[in-house]
């Protein structure tokens, strides 16, 4: 009898994309993008199972050919997190297990980031975790770069597109604010993932367009893990060349 599984990695992969239709199937070094994400994720020793979650038969067929476990989900979901929840339900994930939402457009993801992300769950009180990295004052000016401020216990106080914390007197003698940029990788206890999908979109979530604020507004703490690793997502077709170079550098 096999040991019970306690940590699942789920990769949401939608075919539809306004900026890059069919992105999960984009070829990178002879393989579709989703395969590279799966290959990186399965190198994380914490996972008992890694699976793709898709609404598209073309992606599912390609996954089957390559031997990538795949779960078919409904076509329409409010967010990738909702798709991950449906896949976790179909996989029969127990309430106390950890589910990691692995972005499907991160083919150069460093598996060590995933190890860091799931480490806090050794503490039974942790329900949700995410990652953050140091930001310069210049990087923090962009509203596309989400910032997070963290309490002394390591839990998130707030996420914002604004430059937080605001340094009233300016960064005299250098960047002294200790700004942190949020990395959009999340790990949930299954019960917290279910709770998230049951909650309606919150006021601050709709204002900032940041779904993690739904958790904070409803009293669900998010543990923030600092990392020195950076992500390199694919938003547009022209990003593929950058990823190819990164993969060749890292794996060559």
From Swiss-Prot:
EC category: transferase
Give the domain of life.
Bacteria
Extract one GO cellular component term from the record.
cytosol
Enumerate the subcellular locations listed in this protein's record, separating them with semicolons: Cytoplasm
Query: What does the record give as the reaction this protein catalyses?
Result: 3-deoxy-alpha-D-manno-oct-2-ulosonate + CTP = CMP-3-deoxy-beta-D-manno-octulosonate + diphosphate
List, in alphabetical order, the Gene Ontology terms for molecular function in this entry.
3-deoxy-manno-octulosonate cytidylyltransferase activity
Which keywords describe this protein according to UniProt?
Answer: Cytoplasm, Lipopolysaccharide biosynthesis, Nucleotidyltransferase, Transferase
Q: Does the keyword Cell membrane apply?
A: no
What does this protein's UniProt record list under function?
A: Activates KDO (a required 8-carbon sugar) for incorporation into bacterial lipopolysaccharide in Gram-negative bacteria.
Return the similarity comment: Belongs to the KdsB family.
What is the designated name of this protein?
A: 3-deoxy-manno-octulosonate cytidylyltransferase
Q: What taxonomic ancestry is recorded?
A: Bacteria, Pseudomonadati, Thermodesulfobacteriota, Desulfovibrionia, Desulfovibrionales
């Amino acid at each position: 009898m096999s040991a019970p599984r306690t940590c699942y990695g789920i990769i949401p992969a939608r075919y539809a994309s306004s900026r890059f239709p069919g992105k999960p199937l984009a070829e990178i070094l002879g393989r579709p993008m989703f395969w590279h994400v799966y290959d990186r994720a399965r190198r994380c020793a914490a996972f008992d199972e890694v699976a793709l979650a898709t609404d598209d038969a073309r992606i599912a067929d390609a996954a089957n050919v390559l031997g990538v476990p795949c779960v078919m989900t409904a076509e329409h979901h409010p967010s990738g997190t909702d798709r991950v929840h449906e896949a976790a339900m179909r996989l029969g994930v127990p309430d106390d297990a950890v589910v990691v939402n692995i972005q499907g457009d991160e083919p150069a993801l460093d598996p060590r980031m995933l190890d860091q992300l799931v480490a806090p769950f050794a503490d039974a009180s942790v329900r949700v975790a995410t990652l953050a990295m140091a930001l310069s004052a210049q990087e923090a000016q962009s509203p596309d770069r989400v910032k997070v401020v963290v309490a002394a216990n390591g839990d998130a106080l707030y996420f914002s597109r604004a430059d937080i914390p605001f340094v009233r007197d300016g960064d005299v003698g250098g960047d002294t604010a200790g700004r942190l940029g949020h990395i959009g990788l999340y790990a949930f206890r299954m019960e917290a993932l279910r709770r998230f999908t049951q909650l309606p979109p919150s006021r601050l979530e709709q204002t900032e367009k940041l779904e993690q604020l739904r958790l904070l507004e409803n009293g669900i703490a998010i543990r923030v893990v600092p990392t020195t690793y950076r992500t390199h997502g694919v938003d547009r077709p022209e990003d593929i060349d950058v990823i190819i170079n990164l993969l060749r550098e890292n794996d060559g």
